[in-house]
């Protein structure tokens, strides 16, 4: 498949809440998610891949609200699969 592909650009990022139980237990790390970015730039088909289980729900909730400038192929919006990393750290 040839042509000019323009990658999706994040235009709205919602910071995930850090669950109190995870903070108290000093749990940090990166939650890795797989997503399909729809033609309109919305996140859809979000799946958990890896990372601390206590952080998964808050990461997924925040990422569902993210918005992207749609990916374009030859000037037309297309769906795209992507990997998203949400990093949690204390201090």
Give names to the regions the model predicted.
Residues 1-24, 61-64:
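Acidic, low-complexity proline/glycine/alanine-rich linker and hinge segments
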Residues 8-11, 21, 40-47, 72, ...:
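Periplasm-facing N-terminal accessory domains of Gram-negative outer-membrane beta-barrel systems
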Residues 26-30, 38, 42-74:
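A short, well-structured alpha-helical segment
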Residues 31-33, 82:
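A short, aliphatic-rich beta-strand micro-motif
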């Amino acid at each position: 498949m040839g042509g000019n592909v323009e990658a999706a650009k994040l235009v709205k990022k919602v910071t995930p809440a850090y669950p109190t139980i995870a903070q108290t237990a000093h749990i940090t790390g990166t939650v890795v998610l797989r997503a399909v970015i729809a033609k309109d730039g919305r996140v859809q088909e979000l799946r958990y891949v890896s990372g601390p289980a206590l952080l998964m729900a808050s990461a997924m909730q925040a990422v569902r609200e993210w918005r992207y400038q749609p990916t374009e192929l030859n000037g037309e919006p297309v769906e795209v699969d992507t990997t998203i990393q949400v990093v949690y750290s204390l201090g």
